[in-house]
């Protein structure tokens, strides 16, 4: 099969409007993914607020319209809420949210939630270590939950 130089494919475009007010910020994002026949549209609202005591709160919500799908399966949504702040020599954080984007099934959107907690600390001037634990709920009540532990090490020179 011969490939054309300008073969039609997937097109994506988006726009973002954001405001940063120092100790708070908000962004509104719109995106479209076109695959020739179908057009998926996504809108998201994200924000953060930093308290005077060093604790930061962040949250986000995304809603998608899945073009070309049946009326009972044409929406998706995702959301998260997080909190972090300085504890000792590092930063402690936790978050709860959807495990990716949830897609409507038979007129309802099933929730698959994920939880995480981390502690990030500098070992020296050029290296940061971040241990993390997470729990991801099973996609159905019959499916097993997933628990994971990982360690991220970041280097800078």
Language model: regions and residue ranges:
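C-terminal structured domain segments
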Residues: 115-123
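Long, contiguous hydrophobic alpha-helical segments, chiefly transmembrane helices and signal peptides
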Residues: 60, 95, 119, 127-129
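Detector for outer-membrane/organellar transmembrane beta-barrel domains
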Residues: 10-114
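Short active-site-adjacent structural elements
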Residues: 102-105, 127, 137-142
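Surface-exposed loop and membrane-interface regions of Gram-negative outer-membrane beta-barrel proteins
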Residues: 2-11, 36, 67-70, 137-145
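Compact, aliphatic and Gly/Pro-tolerant "microcore" segments centered on a short helix or tight beta-hairpin
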Residues: 1-3, 125, 130
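Outer-membrane beta-barrel "beta-signal"
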Residues: 121, 127, 133, 145-157
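Acidic carboxylate-rich catalytic motifs and surrounding loops in phosphoryl-/glycosyl-chemistry enzymes
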Residues: 1, 29, 133
């Amino acid at each position: 099969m011969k490939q054309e130089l300008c073969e039609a494919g997937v097109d994506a475009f988006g726009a973002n409007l954001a405001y940063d007010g120092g100790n708070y910020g908000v962004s509104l994002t719109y995106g479209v993914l076109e695959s020739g026949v179908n057009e998926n549209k996504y809108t998201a609202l994200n924000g953060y607020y930093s308290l005077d005591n060093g604790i930061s709160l962040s949250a986000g919500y995304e809603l998608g319209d899945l073009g070309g799908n049946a009326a009972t399966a044409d929406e998706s949504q995702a959301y998260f809420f997080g909190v972090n702040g300085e504890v000792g020599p590092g930063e402690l954080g936790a978050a709860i949210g959807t495990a990716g984007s949830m897609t409507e099934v038979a007129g309802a959107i099933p929730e698959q939630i994920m939880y995480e907690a981390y502690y990030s600390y500098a070992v020296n001037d050029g290296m940061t270590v971040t241990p993390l634990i997470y729990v991801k709920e099973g996609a159905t009540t019959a499916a097993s939950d997933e628990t994971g532990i990982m360690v991220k090490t970041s280097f800078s020179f």
